[in-house]
Amino acid sequence: MEAERPQEEDGEQSLPQDDQGWPPVNATARPWRSAPPSPPPPGTRHTALGPRSGSLLSLQTELLLDLVAEAQSRRLEEQRATFHTPEAPPNLAPAPPRLLEDKEQLYSTILSHQCQRIEAQRSDPPLPPGGQELLELLLRVQGGGRMEEQRSRPPTHTC
């Protein structure tokens, strides 16, 4: 069973149609077409425009939507900007190896200064309440000289 195609009423100007009776679709419009409405069920009253008015309205709606889509497409194309990538001038050669050495030296200088700054900002951890008194008591019991003999040097921080 073949779907009913929209038909034009007599007296209206004819639109060009393809081999299946559909109006042509331009390249910028939608790639799909809406299907014509199904015929009304038997016993339904027709409108004053006749039984084919739904098909004509559907066709007109589709043509209107095609025109709107085409107008919006043209408007977007008019607003599109061109992007030109600048080409590198031929007189600029690749960076010499000296520049790389300078960058490495700068990096190591910054790193060493930051390491020294961090070491300068270090502080001793706070002692718990009564901790200082406990340390003084231990010094008296063990003797000051013995404690100094057992002391080791703290490791040096190298960054």
Curated annotation (Swiss-Prot):
SMART domains (UniProt xref): GoLoco (SM00390)
Q: Where in the cell is it found?
A: Cytoplasm
Q: Name one Pfam family in it.
A: GoLoco
Keyword set for this entry? Answer: Cytoplasm, Phosphoprotein, Repeat
Name under which the protein is recorded? G-protein-signaling modulator 3
Its function, per the record, reads: Interacts with subunit of G(i) alpha proteins and regulates the activation of G(i) alpha proteins.
Q: Where is the GoLoco domain?
A: 61-83, 103-125, 131-154
GO CC terms on record? cytoplasm; plasma membrane
Q: Where is this region: Disordered?
A: 1-54, 77-97
Which spans does this entry mark as compositional bias, Pro residues?
34-43, 87-97
Domain statement: The GoLoco 1 and/or GoLoco 3 domains exhibit GDI activity towards GDP-bound G(i) alpha protein, but not the GoLoco 2 domain.
Q: Which residues carry this modification: Phosphoserine?
A: S34, S38, S55, S58
* UniProt-listed GO biological process terms: positive regulation of cytokine production involved in inflammatory response; positive regulation of inflammatory response; positive regulation of leukocyte chemotaxis
Q: Which domain of life is it from?
A: Eukaryota
Q: What Gene Ontology terms describe what this protein does at the molecular function level? A: GTPase regulator activity
Record flagged with keyword Transferase: no
Provide the primary localization: cytoplasm
The answer, when asked if Mitochondrion is one of the entry's keywords, is no
